[in-house]
């Protein structure tokens, strides 16, 4: 009986399950759908020979992981009867995509899109998976191809006036003057700084400020005073101020204090506007310090944009952490743990790459900072999740395991590097597309046989052996170093430290190209022993310099010495030689910048040290400025074509770049008549942010005059460093014009130079009446941006001249004289008669009185 009940129960359950499954089965029934195919063209009309973007696809999108519709075909009927076909075309998940077409003949083209039958892989829009999308055609689109060119965005020229941040994103041309500085320069790092095409051509100072406003001692810097000739501390050696400066988006970031004390003492990061010197914010990052920066471009189907980070590093229990902070605010965003060791190399989109090679173990590894996030997302959500289109949104405020960033790990040949003393270790160089290694380093005497090799890290060639060579040491009992390398120029350079000679090799084959070069100053051997001096390759030239105080420049293809420059100590203050040391800072806009510094300088500092700018091609001196650089602190940096550097002479930061100006002009307010000389006067003043500092305002209550480029170094040292006022200071040129307010008539008044106070004067004699605008224009210089000012003057007609009688002729004079003479005779006779009559009258009166 119980068996029958069980059988009936099974039947009943089966019926229930069957009935309950009917709606689901019905809802999942496959369908056939005829899509709506579209085609558009941008631009339309289009100029013949120009590209047109065809927007093609269907109106129905796909659901992930179906990435889009496949194998669409674009058919273009040309006016000459021929047909062009674009195939295959695959859409994205929106159902559409773009393809490029370049018409070559004028006339109307007809564009049509064919959509082939295919399956719906993932249910979408109520269409079950497995449904069929029928084949379909778009309507034909008439594409007009014309001879007349189209109007395109004209582009924005580089600024001709003072400019500021932020820069409108439409001004793409300005990318060449808005450079960033992300990390210190050093061995095998490109010394050229793109994005600084207006790098300073004079030492004009924009602003000067102490590391900490209102600071004393090392933070205030300079002479300690109190009757002693010593200076406050500099941070050299080993301690260092202005640590690890970074420039991003027109802001310079740096560590406020020395690194000493690590997390046991207060540590702060400061953000300063590079153009104004204004302190934007100060942040304490759990007593960690700024190490380097990142400007990283993320582009995906969800998001496109640049992320700017300031990165602090720390090591806890042997684990290396990177903490990422927003550059705009200093706010912590996320962290990495277990970051592998290595040298940072910035990839094409700003991603940070690190390579590690283990020649004994026979492997080469690449780590990519971006991959940490993308792999974590795949690990957590799977490879098909749509969140992969975003960068960091769901991981803000978290710590990610950086081991996820290992992009590849490949096997390499064993035994590439011969054994060397353990204290020295093999020298390994990481470049943008290869790793190079040697069996020698500058730490010990080199072996008799020099061993050099290179492995590719380029995509598709990971771990490929490029060369593996040996070379008999031509200078035994000496130290050797792989001093410089350039993939672009195809050369790497070895130097023998003891002799300062160099040899050049082909970077792709290891073949010897040239050498030895001429010897350099013997003191350069000390430079090659240090990590603070290095040779570098730029634009086909090898640049070398150091403790000898001479810049040597060689043709990197031949080893021929092209030119030299001596950084002379003209005052004989330097105890290491007749020249100051040469510390290379960077190259920007074809100009080489370098300065003097020292590992552990004496106190007080030697006087007269310099920062120098040369033409990197010719070696011509462009400018030099009184300056003593730091060895252990932050080196000079450049961004937005502005240099920021710490000067140990007063422990202040100096910003060097082109400054704004203000022009004024005055003319008489009362009306002036034609022909009357008029005095026009005005000023051209430097209004850089530094001129508004109290210390400068008190010395220059009427403002700081703008001066000629050739006077700039001495003038800046006077204004900001309180050197004696230079003699024979030259002003700047001012152009003067007059413009009739009503007619627009233009008169060239001429021009003049300002004097050492910034004032100019011109005497002008108007020749035409009317209401005239007087325009004073300072056209700018290598030091200053231009400025102008206007005033007005009324010129009237001259007053009427008094009438002057016409001189009488001789005849008129004679006639007049005759008339006068005749009148004189008559008057004389009349006078006699009057006298006689008068006398007779008196006589008659007297006679009458006697009779009475």
Where is each model-derived feature located?
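Secretory targeting signatures
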Residues: 1-30, 56, 203, 330, ...
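Proline/serine/threonine-rich low-complexity linkers at boundaries of modular beta-sandwich domains
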Residues: 25-36, 655-662
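Short beta-strand segments of immunoglobulin-like
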Residues: 41-46, 667-672
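Structural beta-strand segments of beta-rich domains
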Residues: 50-54, 676-680
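Short flexible loop/turn segments that cap and initiate beta-strands
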Residues: 59-87, 207, 690-748
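Residue-level recognition of secondary-structure-to-loop junctions
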Residues: 92, 98-105, 109, 115, ...
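Enriched for extracellular/lumenal, surface-exposed ectodomains of secreted and cell-surface proteins
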Residues: 109-133, 768-786
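Repeat-blade elements of multi-bladed beta-propeller folds
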Residues: 160-185, 222-269, 287-322, 343-377, ...
């Amino acid at each position: 009986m119980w068996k029958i009940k069980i059988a009936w129960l099974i039947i009943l359950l089966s019926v229930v399950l069957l009935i309950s499954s009917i709606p689901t089965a019905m809802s999942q029934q496959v369908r056939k759908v005829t899509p709506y195919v579209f085609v558009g063209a941008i631009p339309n009309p289009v100029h013949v020979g120009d590209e047109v973007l065809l927007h093609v696809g269907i109106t129905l999108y796909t659901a992930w992981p179906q990435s889009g519709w496949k194998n669409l075909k674009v058919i273009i009927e040309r006016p000459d009867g021929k047909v062009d076909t674009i195939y295959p075309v695959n859409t994205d998940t929106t159902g559409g995509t773009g393809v490029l077409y370049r018409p070559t003949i004028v006339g109307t083209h007809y564009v049509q899109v064919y959509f082939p039958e295919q399956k719906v892989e993932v249910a979408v829009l109520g269409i079950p998976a497995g449904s069929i999308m029928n084949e379909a055609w778009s309507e034909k689109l008439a594409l007009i191809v014309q001879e007349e060119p189209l109007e395109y965005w004209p582009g924005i020229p580089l600024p001709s006036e003072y400019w500021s941040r932020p820069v409108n994103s439409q001004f793409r041309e300005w990318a060449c003057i808005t450079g960033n500085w992300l990390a210190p320069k050093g061995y095998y790092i490109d010394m050229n700084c793109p994005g600084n095409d207006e790098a300073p051509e004079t030492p004009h100072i924009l602003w000067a400020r102490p590391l900490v406003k209102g600071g004393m001692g090392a933070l205030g810097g300079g002479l300690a005073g109190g009757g002693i000739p010593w200076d406050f501390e500099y941070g050299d050696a080993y301690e260092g101020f202005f640590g690890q400066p970074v420039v991003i988006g027109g802001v310079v970031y740096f560590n406020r204090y020395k690194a000493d004390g690590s997390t046991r003492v207060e540590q702060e990061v400061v953000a300063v506007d590079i153009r104004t010197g204004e302190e934007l914010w100060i942040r304490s990052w759990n007593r960690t310090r700024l190490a380097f920066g990142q400007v990283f471009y993320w582009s995906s189907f969800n998001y496109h944009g640049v992320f700017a980070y300031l990165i602090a590093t720390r090591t806890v229990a042997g684990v290396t952490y990177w903490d990422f902070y927003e550059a705009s605010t200093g706010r912590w965003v996320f962290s990495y743990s277990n970051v592998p060791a290595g040298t940072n190399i910035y990839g094409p989109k700003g991603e940070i790459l690190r390579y590690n090679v283990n020649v004994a173990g026979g492997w080469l590894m690449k780590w990519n900072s971006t991959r940490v996030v993308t792999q974590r997302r795949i690990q957590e959500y799977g490879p098909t999740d749509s969140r992969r289109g975003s960068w960091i949104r769901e991981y803000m405020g978290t710590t990610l395991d950086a081991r996820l960033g290992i992009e590849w790990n490949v096997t390499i040949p064993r035994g590439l590097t011969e054994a060397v003393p353990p204290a020295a270790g093999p020298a390994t160089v990481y470049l943008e597309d290869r790793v190079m290694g040697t069996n020698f380093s500058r730490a010990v005497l080199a072996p008799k046989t020099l061993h050099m090799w290179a492995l590719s890290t380029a995509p598709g060639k990971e771990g490929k052996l490029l060369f593996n060579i040996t070379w008999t040491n031509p200078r035994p009992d000496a130290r050797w170093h792989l001093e410089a390398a350039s993939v672009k120029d195809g050369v790497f350079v070895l130097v023998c430290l003891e002799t300062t000679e160099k040899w050049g090799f082909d970077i792709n084959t290891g073949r010897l190209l040239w050498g030895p070069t001429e010897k350099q100053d013997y003191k350069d051997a000390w430079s090659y022993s240090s990590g603070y001096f290095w040779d570098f390759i730029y634009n086909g030239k090898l640049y070398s310099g150091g403790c000898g105080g001479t810049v040597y420049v060689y043709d990197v293809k031949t080893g021929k010495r092209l030119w030299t420059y001596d950084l002379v100590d003209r005052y004989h203050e330097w105890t290491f030689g007749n020249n100051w040391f040469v510390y290379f800072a960077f190259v920007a806009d074809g100009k080489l910048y370098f300065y003097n510094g020292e590992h552990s300088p004496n106190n007080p500092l030697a006087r007269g040290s310099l920062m120098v700018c040369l033409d990197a091609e010719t070696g011509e001196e462009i400018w030099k400025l009184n300056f003593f650089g730091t060895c252990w602190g932050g080196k000079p940096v450049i961004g937005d074509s502005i240099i920021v550097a710490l000067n140990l002479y007063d422990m202040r930061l100096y910003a060097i770049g082109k400054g704004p100006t203000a022009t004024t002009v005055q003319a008489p307010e009362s009306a002036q008549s034609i022909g009357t000389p008029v005095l026009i006067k005005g000023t051209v003043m430097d209004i850089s942010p530094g001129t508004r500092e109290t210390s400068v305002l008190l010395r220059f209550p009427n403002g700081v005059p703008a001066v000629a480029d050739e006077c700039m170094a001495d003038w800046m040292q006077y204004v900001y460093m309180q050197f004696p006022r230079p003699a024979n200071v030259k002003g700047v040129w001012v152009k003067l014009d007059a413009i009739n307010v009503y007619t627009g008539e233009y008169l060239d008044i001429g021009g003049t130079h300002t004097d050492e106070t910034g004032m100019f004067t011109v005497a002008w004699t108007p020749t035409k009446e009317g209401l005239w605008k007087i325009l004073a224009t300072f056209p700018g210089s290598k030091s200053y941006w231009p400025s102008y000012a206007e005033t007005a003057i009324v010129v009237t007609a001259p007053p009427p001249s008094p009438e002057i009688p016409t001189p009488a002729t001789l005849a008129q004079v004679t006639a007049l004289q005759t008339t006068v003479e005749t009148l004189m005779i008559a008057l004389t006779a009349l006078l006699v008669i009057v006298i006689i009559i008068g006398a007779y009258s008196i006589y008659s009166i007297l006679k009458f009185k006697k009779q009475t």
